[in-house]
């Protein structure tokens, strides 16, 4: 079957609400950091399936766990009975969590995990108001989309949860308060205090939802002491801190959870994407008293705690431990940041390089002074990278998303960075025509 036919059939059967594409790759095989398409072309994957493949595509340990479990028991519903696999996984998550003696509720996606976190936070505090960040992304289910700070136009069509308020995220490259790093007085923290003195009754707020590093906003890393200052304000008013580690968790930034970089302990953590190694599974990890605040079946789905997905997830965590992938992510991330920093010196198109571990953003701009986002140029870079055999995407329309598997070989990382540099050079020097714009959509 031809690639073009498959893509055309996709457009006929799947709604646009379910997908957004960057390149016409019909994948048929993958291993570690490489993907092969239906035409037998090889690609280096700098996207990790949208930050899913932390331990690499088709990881041998994960595949073995799936096969063994599928031969023995595929499913026995968690909500009515008992199986060993989700228990072992939950105990392992509790072990690596920065929350002491937590309880864990399983789900199927990051979206439903964040929906669950909303329910647990409101039930425990008996408060309704929620705080979230502008440009945040928590998922596409009803609750998760209600606290998402990106403008998707979805809420205007379908409605949203009430009592949600937004605050600016501390973006030091494009400061929402117009400050520079050397003149910053943490106005982003003072804004929260002012919010509580004005339109929001602080003692009615259940939780602040936060990404420790804003992923889909363009890999935005906050100042090191930001969350410490915010947590002090929250604690004064009995407000919970719920952190979304769906994209940043399980070693991606060089820590089990990205929030650990900032020296605070959250009350609730949501985990998903890389947890199942490609299988659908998520978790809400929270303080026991918070997690016990909902009644029986208050956050339950028929397929949660699936033995196959649980066994795969346990294998993912074991692989991260056994191969010391936290240290590897930190080391390779530091190396990649240095190489990308050198590219920034060479190419005016690169305005900023930021990130932690192997969660990196390359901010493309039309002008370094104005920081005007280079939307068309980003599309052209992604297209040229595809032609060169590199899978890369962008966020916010202009920030290249660099998130290869934590298991990527050093030489493969270098090869991918070489391809990326060539793509950027070709775009900057005008060697990629406007016809590329009609092929790349993204968001």
UniProtKB/Swiss-Prot annotation:
Query: Which InterPro entries does its entry note?
Result: Aminotrans_3, Aminotrans_3_PPA_site, Class-III_PLP-dep_AT, LeuMetRace, PyrdxlP-dep_Trfase, PyrdxlP-dep_Trfase_major, PyrdxlP-dep_Trfase_small
Ranges in a coiled coil: none
Kindly provide the name given to this protein in its UniProt entry.
Leucine/methionine racemase
Q: What does this protein do?
A: Amino acid racemase with moderate substrate specificity. Is primarily active toward leucine, which is the preferred substrate, and methionine. Also exhibits lower levels of activity toward phenylalanine, alanine and serine.
- Disulfide partners: none
Q: Would you identify the family this protein belongs to, as annotated? A: Belongs to the class-III pyridoxal-phosphate-dependent aminotransferase family.
Domain of life according to the entry: Archaea
- Which transformation does this protein catalyse, written as a reaction? L-leucine = D-leucine; L-methionine = D-methionine
What keywords were assigned to this record?
Isomerase, Pyridoxal phosphate
Q: How is its activity regulated?
A: Activity is strongly inhibited by several metal ions, including Co(2+), Zn(2+), Ni(2+), Cu(2+) and Fe(3+), and nonsubstrate amino acids such as L-arginine and L-lysine. Activity is completely abolished in the presence of hydroxylamine, an inhibitor of pyridoxal phosphate-dependent enzymes.
Signal sequence residues: none
The reply on keyword Isomerase is yes
Q: Does the keyword Phosphoprotein apply?
A: no
Gene Ontology molecular-function annotations: identical protein binding; isomerase activity; pyridoxal phosphate binding; transaminase activity
Thermal behaviour (record text)? Optimum temperature is 70-80 degrees Celsius.
Q: Please tell me where pyridoxal 5'-phosphate binds in this chain.
A: 110-111, 247, 302
The prosthetic group or cofactor this protein requires is: pyridoxal 5'-phosphate
Kindly list the positions at which N6-(pyridoxal phosphate)lysine occurs in this protein: 273
Q: SUPFAM superfamilies of this UniProt entry?
A: PLP-dependent transferases
Q: Name one Pfam family in it.
A: Aminotran_3
The EC number(s) given in the record are 5.1.1.-, 5.1.1.2
């Amino acid at each position: 079957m031809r690639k073009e036919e498959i893509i055309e059939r996709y457009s006929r059967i799947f709604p646009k609400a379910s997908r957004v594409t960057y390149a016409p790759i019909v994948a048929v095989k993958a291993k570690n950091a490489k993907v092969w398409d239906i035409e037998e072309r090889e690609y280096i994957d700098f996207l990790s399936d949208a930050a899913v493949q932390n331990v690499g595509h088709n990881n041998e340990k994960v595949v073995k766990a799936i096969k063994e479990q599928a031969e023995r028991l595929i499913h026995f519903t968690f909500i009515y009975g008992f199986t060993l696999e989700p228990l072992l996984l939950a105990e392992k998550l509790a072990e690596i969590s920065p929350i002491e003696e937590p309880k864990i509720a399983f789900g199927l996606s990051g979206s439903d995990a964040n929906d669950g976190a909303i329910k647990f936070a409101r039930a425990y505090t008996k408060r309704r108001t929620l705080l979230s960040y502008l440009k945040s992304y928590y998922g596409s289910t009803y609750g998760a989309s209600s606290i998402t700070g990106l403008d998707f136009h979805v809420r205007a069509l379908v409605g949203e949860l009430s009592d949600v308020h937004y605050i600016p995220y501390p973006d030091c490259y494009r400061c929402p308060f117009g400050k520079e790093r050397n003149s910053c007085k943490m106005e982003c923290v003072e804004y929260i205090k002012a919010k509580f003195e004005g339109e929001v009754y602080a003692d009615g707020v259940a939780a602040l939802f936060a990404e420790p590093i804003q992923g889909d906003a363009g890999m935005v890393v906050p100042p090191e002491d930001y969350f410490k200052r915010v947590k002090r304000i929250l604690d004064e008013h009995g407000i919970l801190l719920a952190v979304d580690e769906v994209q940043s968790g399980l070693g991606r930034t060089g820590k089990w959870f990205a929030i650990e970089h900032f020296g605070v302990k959250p009350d609730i953590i949501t985990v998903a994407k890389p947890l199942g190694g490609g299988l659908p599974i998520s978790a809400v990890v929270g303080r026991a008293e918070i997690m016990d605040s909902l009644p029986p079946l208050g956050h339950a789905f028929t397929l949660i705690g699936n033995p196959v997905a649980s066994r795969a997830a346990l294998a993912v965590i074991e692989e991260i431990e056994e191969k010391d992938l936290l240290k590897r992510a930190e080391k390779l991330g530091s190396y990649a940041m240095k190489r990308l920093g050198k590219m920034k010196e060479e190419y005016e198109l690169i305005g900023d390089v930021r990130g932690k571990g192997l969660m990196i953003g390359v901010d493309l701009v039309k002008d370094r002074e104005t920081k005007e986002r280079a939307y068309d140029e980003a599309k052209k870079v992604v297209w040229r990278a595809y032609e060169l055999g590199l899978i890369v995407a962008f966020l916010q329309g202009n920030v290249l998303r660099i998130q290869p598997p934590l298991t990527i070989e050093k030489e493969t990382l270098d090869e991918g960075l070489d391809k990326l540099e060539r793509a950027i050079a070709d775009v900057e020097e005008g060697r990629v025509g406007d016809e590329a714009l009609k092929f790349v959509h993204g968001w």
